[in-house]
Amino acid sequence: MNKQTILRIAKYISICFLTVFIAAIMLGGGLFLYYVSNAPALSESKLVATTSSKIYDNNDELIADLGSERRVNAQANEIPTDLVNAIVSIEDHRFFNHRGIDTIRILGATLRNLRGGGGLQGASTLTQQLIKLTYFSTSTSDQTLSRKAQEAWLAVQLEQKATKQEILTYYINKVYMSNGNYGMQTAAQSYYGKDLKDLSIPQLALLAGMPQAPNQYDPYSHPEAAQERRNLVLSEMKGQGYITAEQYEKAINTPITDGLQSLKSANSYPPYMDNYLKEVIDQVEQETGYNLLTTGMEVYTNVDSKVQQRLWDIYNTDEYVNYPDDELQVASTIVDVTDGKVIAQLGARHQSSNVSFGINQAVETNRDWGSTMKPITDYAPALEYGVYDSTASIVHDSPYNYPGTSTPVYNWDKSYFGNITLQYALQQSRNVPAVETLEKVGLDRAKTFLNGLGIDYPSIHYANAISSNTTESDKKYGASSEKMAAAYAAFANGGIYPKPMYINKIVFSDGSSKEFSDSGTRAMKETTAYMMTDMMKTVLAYGTGRGAYLPWLPQAGKTGTSNYTDDEIENYIKNTGYVAPDEMFVGYTRKYSMAVWTGYSNRLTPIVGDGFYVAAKVYRSMMTYLSEDDHPGDWTM
């Protein structure tokens, strides 16, 4: 092949590449123009304001007006340089050099996402974040090419119309800062009793780091996470040359509580609604991608205000339950068994009215639900998969080791009943038959069955026959009152599992609306659900759940008690009597399912004596209120 031929081939290839390149640019440009043609118009009023969201109960009565609580806007000349440096350090290093979009950041994020297989994440400038907060959903599923194009287009437009100082001011006044505070000046006054200009570098660094996850980095509810985030901001400030090494060392060694004052209540709603509203906020964001704290909307929920108020009264007075002390905690969830509507939920006793959307133990999975796991992990799968054919099947309560080990399984009383019926094993909450049943079912089948009831483990073990303990308890894995109430609802509802639903309708600011409901999915055969209910009726009438029994009300349920390890008892508990870290009761009627957890915030503070009866009594008091004027009747096949 001569030199001229090679040159012709090279020229041909170059022309082809150039043609493809030009075509790609034209196609991309056309697609970009199509996307941005549907972008909303820039509006200073929207950049400045945060419209409040109104929340209604299941009778369409207003229960909260969120977003209207506190707002003190900072003027541009009131914003300290250290705050600006902190914000750009953690959010947008090249903020003062780009014009709305950062091509270097886009290329870096693209390479990271290609390596990690992720979506269009990590490339947003501070200007784009402001646009997103003002106009768009923050849901990961909504980070589409169309949305990204519109976001970039509006960011470039905003940079042409506003100065960098104005954009920063919009952002500083726009962001949600937890506990009902909107804008960093509002947070400064609420948390420190000072204006922004009077705060120290570590205090400003904390505020600068909060907007990405304001409730998670709340220094009152999550001081450790807040300190970690603050220190990351300080590290970035040092790396960018905004503070010296000496200033950095001094700042990171400043306690996160330095200067914090007691919170004053800013809530426009009663304290008994706080936990429920937190879950409403989360579900709205899961379903729509919008944060109702920064996006105006009307949300219609499933909470029954009267039931929620009664649950609060049961927790916080001695009129219904005699508590052993003020420190014993309770967390519970009540769902409608037919559609999963959460009609009431409360995560603690004696909650502070000064904290908004704090930890809600009712949805946390960090405590062990003990023997309440037996119906859903062991016995229901055994009936479903034909391991046992009736409630009268014989099981063995005799010396037995966890499969594949030399570790014995003990019953709570360290004794054995011999051959007993399946019903009696569940009624008396015997551990040995439960673990042996799980072995017969098989771990894989049990895990699949649990998944159908909304419960999962990173990996399931034979110990999970009588425990919900898991290596990861981040609400995804393990059990909570929310998860257990919904799981047991499937027994009450003929085997149909309903997803817990807090919201039923949203009306957006543009007048459009969306309804939310869950028709449920079949988790087990109707016969399985009926046999499980038949067995668990005897738990209340004759077994471990007699404290929840109401002779006039057809209901079923299961008690649960977790255990300390021998090491914990020897080194920490040092109590020779019967003690436990957690006591639970999960029960249901044909209409409602309720799960109750009791225990101390410090797990090493044991439940003793009468404390073991609190969970059943809370359930009994609530079910009496729910059913005495609305008798749900009995189950039939």
UniProtKB/Swiss-Prot annotation:
Subcellular location: Secreted
Keywords per UniProt: Antibiotic resistance, Carboxypeptidase, Cell shape, Cell wall biogenesis/degradation, Glycosyltransferase, Hydrolase, Multifunctional enzyme, Peptidoglycan synthesis, Protease, Secreted, Transferase
Positions of region (Transpeptidase): 298-612
Residue span of region Transglycosylase: 62-224
GO molecular function annotations of the record: penicillin binding; peptidoglycan glycosyltransferase activity; serine-type D-Ala-D-Ala carboxypeptidase activity
Gene Ontology cellular-component annotations: extracellular region; outer membrane-bounded periplasmic space
Regions crossing the membrane: none
Residues in coiled coil: none
Reaction(s) the record says it catalyses: [GlcNAc-(1->4)-Mur2Ac(oyl-L-Ala-gamma-D-Glu-L-Lys-D-Ala-D-Ala)](n)-di-trans,octa-cis-undecaprenyl diphosphate + beta-D-GlcNAc-(1->4)-Mur2Ac(oyl-L-Ala-gamma-D-Glu-L-Lys-D-Ala-D-Ala)-di-trans,octa-cis-undecaprenyl diphosphate = [GlcNAc-(1->4)-Mur2Ac(oyl-L-Ala-gamma-D-Glu-L-Lys-D-Ala-D-Ala)](n+1)-di-trans,octa-cis-undecaprenyl diphosphate + di-trans,octa-cis-undecaprenyl diphosphate + H(+); Preferential cleavage: (Ac)2-L-Lys-D-Ala-|-D-Ala. Also transpeptidation of peptidyl-alanyl moieties that are N-acyl substituents of D-alanine
Enzyme Commission code(s) on record: 2.4.99.28, 3.4.16.4
Biological processes annotated in GO: cell wall organization; peptidoglycan biosynthetic process; proteolysis; regulation of cell shape; response to antibiotic
Family to which this protein belongs: In the N-terminal section; belongs to the glycosyltransferase 51 family.
This protein's name: Penicillin-binding protein 1A
UniProt organism field: Streptococcus oralis
